[in-house]
Amino acid sequence: KKSLYYAVLAKAGLPDAMETISKGFDSGSAVDKDNAFYALLNIKGMAAADKLAEIAAADDAAYAAKALDVYVQRIAASDKTPENKTLLLSDVLDIAGSNKALSAADARKIETKALQGLENNKTFQGMMLAGKYLGNADADVSQAAVMAVIRTALAHKEFYGPAVTELLKKAVELNKDKDSNYQREEVQKHLASLPATGGFVSMFNGKDLTGWKGLVENPIARAKMKPAELAKKQAAADETMRKDWVVNNGLMEYVGHGFD
């Protein structure tokens, strides 16, 4: 039976297992599809991660939520660096927030788990990403974001500056944890211990590309240019930059095709 065949392939971890199981999911009968899917869920490590992410982002409600949930589990259990896990969890949040095949309840549950993952990894990028979910309409999502911001900041004294202070103050106000009073005191002491100036200053306002400019050749070449030539090339570079970069859901997204 193919159900047993897929299960054996998944357990054995053979090099061609993913290709065979993926083919069964993509083009097999309804029964084959189900069997292949459950085999994918049982492949340990990150071997099936890309396929699970693909299924999670697709419009098949029968599989999307479970695929995304297991994908989050695989990220958490992997040996990837905290920075790489943060990037993958960012993709999870994008899928959870945009895939209409997910029910609202499933999307919120997965967002909560992804934010908890950001808390566990405690990266600067993860803290800033979690900040976008502070005050979310779903209480669990908002609280997960609160804890990700607070615990990441408290673990890293090198994370400071106006943007970090603003996030921490907002997180403290929204905190519904049973230990919120104690955590408020921790945050206040933490903020008082940080340098009053310097630190992280956001180069991106989260709305548009104001202040961003395209790159004109290299510093040596620019230094040799006359003002009129530099201005002309800068205008062309700025136009290219605006074509290559867009703002999507508060994040800068590259849509270009690389350098010529």
Describe each region flagged by the PLM:
Residues 158-173, 226:
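Charge-dense, low-complexity polyampholytic segments
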Residues 73-78, 92-100, 154, 173, ...:
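Short regulatory "switch" loops immediately downstream of catalytic or recognition motifs
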Residues 2-15, 20-23, 33-45, 54, ...:
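Structural detector for internal amphipathic alpha-helices that build alpha-solenoid repeat scaffolds
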Residues 21, 36, 52, 114, ...:
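Hydrophobic beta-strand residues in large extracellular and virion-surface proteins
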